[in-house]
Design a protein with these regions (language model features):
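A substrate-binding/cap region within the structured catalytic cores of diverse enzymes
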Residues: 139-167, 172-206, 210, 395-398
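Second-shell residues forming the walls of enzyme active-site clefts
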Residues: 49, 67, 91-108, 115, ...
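Active-site-proximal loop/short-helix segments
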Residues: 129-134, 168-188, 219-235, 267
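Short acidic/polar active-site loop segments enriched in Thr and Asp
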Residues: 81, 168-169, 262, 330
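A short aromatic-anchored loop/beta-hairpin motif
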Residues: 60, 79-89
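Preference for extracellular/luminal or secreted protein segments
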Residues: 1-78, 294, 314-400
C-alpha cells in the first residue's frame, strides 16, 4: 500500500516536471518567435529609404473605380502604407475584386511590404460593400439584439466577406457610447447608450472580425457619442472631466485594449478639460499620456480622416500633420485623393529635414505598423473571382 503511494507520488512529480518543461519550451518558442519577428522588422526598417519609411505612415483615398496613373505612381514611388476604399470606388463585386487585385499587383513589385487595403464597413447606414451583397445590420440593431454571440457572429461573417474582396483592415466597430440623443453623426452607428452594452457588443464584434484574420480598428477615441457637432464639418468640444470620461466614454476602449485590440482610430474632438487647445488627434496629452502611458496601449493609432471639416476648417494641413505625428499617432488617414496624400508625405519629409519631427519618432510608428502587418501575415496575393450567390447565402445563413 505504502509502495503504491510512493509510486503515485513519484509519477505525479514527474508529470508535473514534464508539464513544466513543456511550458518552458512553449515560452522559449514564443520568445524565439518574437525575437525573430523583431529582428526581421529591424532589418526591414534599416533597409528602407526615406520615401519608403514616410509612405508607410499614410493611408490614402483616391477617386474612381480603377487605378489611375497618379495612384499607381503613389503606390510605386511613395510606397504608401495603405489605401481606403469608399462607395465611390465600388461599382459591383467583380469590379471590386479587379480593383483590389490591381492594387496588390502594383504594390507587390514596389517595395515588398504588403499594403493595407482598408474600408470602414460598419453595417447599417455606413456600408461600402457592393449593392449586390446582402446588407449587414447596424450596431444599434446588434445592441438591441443583446446577444454577445450574435455580435461575434456578425463580426466574423463580415470579416470573411470583406476578406473575400481583398480587404485586410476594417475601421470598425464604433465604440462610442451614444449618450446624447441629439447626436446624429453617431446615433445608430453605436451599439447603445450604455457603456457596458457598448463594451460587451463591441468587443465581440471586434473579436469576430479578428477571428477572420481581418484587422479591426476600433473608433472614435476618446468617444464621439456625446458631441453636438459633427466632426465631418466642424470641431466638436467635450466639457467632461476625466472622472466622467473614465466612467463612460473611455470604458469600451480600455476594455478593447485589455482584449488586445490591434488598432484605434482617434477622432478630431477637443477634450476641454484635458487639452483645450488641440483636438485629440493632435494632442500629446490624449494620445501619448492617456492612450500610450495610462492605458498601456502598444498597438497602431490611426487618425480619423485628416481632411474632415474639424481639421480643414481650423488648421493648416502642415501644422495638423506635424502635430499629429508629434502627438504619437502612427498612421494618417487622408481620403481626399492622391494629390493631397502626396502633399502630406512631402510635409513629413520636410519636417524630418528641418528637425520638426525626429527620425526616432518615425521609426517608432514604423515598427508598430510593420509589426501589425507581420502579425496578420498580410500578403499581396491576388484573389480569384467570387461566387455571389454563395456569399449572400453565407451571410443569410449566419446572421439573418
Amino acid at each position: 500500500m505504502k509502495n503504491g503511494r510512493w509510486i503515485l507520488l513519484i509519477s505525479i512529480f514527474f508529470l508535473l516536471l514534464l508539464g513544466l518543461c513543456i511550458g518552458q519550451k512553449d515560452k522559449l518558442s514564443f520568445w524565439l518567435s518574437s525575437l525573430k519577428e523583431k529582428r526581421e522588422i529591424e532589418n526591414q526598417i534599416n533597409s528602407m529609404n526615406l520615401d519608403e519609411k514616410v509612405g508607410q505612415l499614410v493611408i490614402s483615398g483616391f477617386k474612381g473605380e480603377t487605378i489611375s496613373e497618379e495612384l499607381k505612381e503613389l503606390i510605386e514611388k511613395s510606397h504608401i502604407g495603405g489605401v481606403i476604399l469608399f462607395s465611390s470606388n465600388i461599382k459591383d463585386s467583380n469590379q471590386l475584386i479587379e480593383l483590389t487585385n490591381s492594387i496588390k499587383d502594383i504594390n507587390s513589385i514596389s517595395d515588398g511590404i504588403p499594403i493595407f487595403i482598408s474600408v470602414d464597413q460598419e453595417g447599417g447606414r455606413v456600408s461600402r460593400l457592393p449593392k449586390d451583397i446582402e446588407k449587414f445590420p447596424s450596431a444599434a440593431h446588434i445592441g438591441d439584439h443583446g446577444d454577445e454571440n450574435y455580435s461575434y457572429k456578425v463580426g466574423n461573417t463580415l470579416g470573411q466577406v470583406i476578406k473575400t474582396f481583398g480587404f485586410n483592415l476594417n475601421f470598425a466597430p464604433v465604440l462610442d457610447v451614444a449618450s446624447n440623443p441629439e447626436n446624429k453623426v453617431i446615433g445608430d452607428r453605436a451599439f447603445g447608450d450604455n457603456e457596458d452594452l457598448v463594451r460587451r457588443m463591441g468587443l465581440q464584434f471586434m473579436n469576430g472580425l479578428r477571428s477572420s484574420n481581418v484587422i479591426s480598428v476600433v473608433k472614435h477615441f476618446p468617444g464621439h457619442g456625446d458631441t453636438k457637432e459633427d466632426s465631418h464639418y466642424e470641431l466638436p468640444y467635450l466639457n467632461h472631466h476625466k472622472e466622467r470620461l473614465d466612467a463612460i466614454e473611455f470604458v469600451p476602449f480600455k476594455k478593447a485594449i485589455d482584449d488586445g485590440t490591434d488598432g484605434i482610430m482617434v477622432s478630431h474632438i477637443v477634450l476641454k478639460n484635458i487639452d483645450n487647445k488641440n483636438p485629440a488627434t493632435m494632442s500629446k496629452a490624449v494620445v501619448t499620456d492617456i492612450l500610450r502611458k495610462e492605458f498601456n496601449y502598444e498597438g497602431v493609432i490611426f487618425t480619423d480622416d485628416i481632411n474632415m471639416g474639424a481639421i480643414a476648417n481650423n488648421y493648416l494641413l502642415r501644422d495638423a500633420v506635424i502635430k499629429t505625428i508629434d502627438a504619437g499617432v502612427d498612421v494618417i488617414v487622408s481620403s481626399k485623393g492622391v494629390e493631397d496624400t502626396k502633399f502630406i508625405i512631402e510635409i513629413i519629409k520636410d519636417a524630418l529635414k528641418k528637425g520638426d519631427i525626429s527620425e526616432e519618432r518615425i521609426k517608432e510608428s514604423l515598427n508598430r505598423i510593420l509589426k501589425l502587418k507581420y502579425k496578420y501575415s498580410l500578403e499581396d496575393k491576388k484573389l480569384s473571382n467570387i461566387n455571389l450567390d454563395k456569399i449572400n447565402r453565407f451571410i443569410n445563413d449566419n446572421i439573418k
